UniProtKB/Swiss-Prot annotation:
One of its GO terms (molecular function) is transcription cis-regulatory region binding. Consists of two structural and functional domains: an N-terminal DNA-binding domain, approximately the first 60 residues, and a larger C-terminal domain, approximately 280 residues, which imparts the function of corepressor binding and oligomerization. The lineage of its organism: Bacteria, Pseudomonadati, Pseudomonadota, Gammaproteobacteria, Vibrionales. Homodimer. Keywords: DNA-binding, Purine biosynthesis, Repressor, Transcription, Transcription regulation. It comes from Aliivibrio salmonicida (strain LFI1238) (Vibrio salmonicida (strain LFI1238)). Pathway: Purine metabolism; purine nucleotide biosynthesis [regulation]. This is HTH-type transcriptional repressor PurR. NCBIfam families: PRK10703.1. Residues 4-23, 48-56 bind DNA.
Length: 333
């Protein structure tokens, strides 16, 4: 099995230079990098992660707990995380918890055993029990992303869901809608509480009220939006516009409405939330609330790497500011 000395000899460089090239820890001339990587490939060299971690007290790995990796919103944010980790020479261990407490505990224990250098947490389902377990790991640098609970011991990214809910509802009101319903996520989740608070704030500012029958509790999945729309269409007094708390529910709502022969936006207007890539290509293209997902992913890693370098760094809070992306799914009355 090839060693770092073999690579250095073949590339005509020092072992220190080989280490810097492989770990991306210092600038090395492009021509030198090319020789090193050619030697690595020719010798099929794989550095020992165990030896490196013992020598440097670092594994160059980051763990990530995420609720649902298959949801487009999470997938796009994770792309930003993974891409920036790779550029910085870190390997990402992504753990899809699916909201299961036992899986969350198992993955957290596994990541601790792997001696990851830091942890990103993007779980809406963090309960007090798991949060307490996270806070026991005071030596582990950690960034709470998106919907996670607040903690004085971790850096945090805030998505300003209340502001987003307000902007979405205000946009519908500005287009003449006074009969507005919404398809929410689980109402016990912090992000849903914030978005519906923004929804009611916009209505209140316009001296409007919402029929409680027009508030449909979903779960951020397509099937819940489809069932909600089915209930809505059976009502005699229907809203003229729906605010869906994420884009995939909005797209499901549009599909269900169109299957009944009604038109979006001529008969019912729809606004979504997240601005996933697919939303621009649906029919009609979806008006939605934009969140800079890939940039947030990159920022989360930047904050975490700062924390890894300096565990006593002042706590950082990064705020996202949502904005309306106007397309074709909202009709002006």
């Amino acid at each position: 099995m090839a060693t770092i000395k073999d690579v250095a000899k073949l590339a005509s460089v020092s072992t220190t230079t080989v280490s810097h090239v492989i770990n991306k820890t210092r600038f090395v001339a492009e021509a030198t990098q090319k020789r090193v990587w050619e030697a690595v490939e020719e010798l099929n060299y794989a550095p020992s992660a165990v030896a490196r971690s013992l020598k440097c007290n670092t594994t160059r790995t980051i763990g990530m707990l995420v609720t649902q990796s298959f949801n487009p919103f999470f997938a796009e944010m994770m792309h930003g995380v993974e891409n920036y980790c790779y550029k910085q020479g870190y390997t990402l261990f992504m753990c899809n918890t699916e909201g299961d407490l036992d899986k969350q505990k198992h993955y957290l224990r596994m990541l601790a055993e792997k001696r990851v250098d830091g942890l990103l947490v993007m779980c809406s389902d963090l309960n007090e029990q798991l949060l307490a377990q996270l806070e026991k790991n005071t030596e582990l640098p950690m960034v709470i992303m998106d919907w996670g609970p607040d903690s004085p011991h971790t850096d945090k990214i805030i998505d300003n869901s209340e502001e987003g809910g307000y902007l979405a509802t205000k946009h519908l009101i500005e287009n003449g809608h006074t009969k507005i319903g919404c398809v929410t996520g689980q109402l016990d989740k912090a992000t849903c509480k914030e978005r519906i608070h923004g929804f009611y704030r916009a209505l209140s500012e316009a001296n409007l009220t919402s029929n409680p029958d027009w508030i449909f509790e979903g779960d951020f999945e397509c099937s819940s939006a489809s069932k909600s729309v089915e209930k809505m269409l059976q009502m005699e007094d229907k809203p003229t516009a729906l605010f869906c708390f994420n884009d995939i529910m909005a797209l499901a709502a549009i599909s269900k409405i169109q299957q009944t022969g009604l038109r979006v936006p001529e008969d019912i207007s729809i606004i979504g939330y997240d601005n996933i890539e697919l939303s621009a290509y649906f029919s009609p293209p979806l008006t939605t609330i934009h969140q800079p997902k890939r940039r947030v992913g990159k920022t989360a890693v930047e904050i975490l790497l700062e924390r890894i370098k300096d565990k006593h760094h002042e706590r950082r809070i990064f705020e996202m500011h949502p904005e309306v992306v106007t397309r074709k799914s909202v009709h002006k009355l």
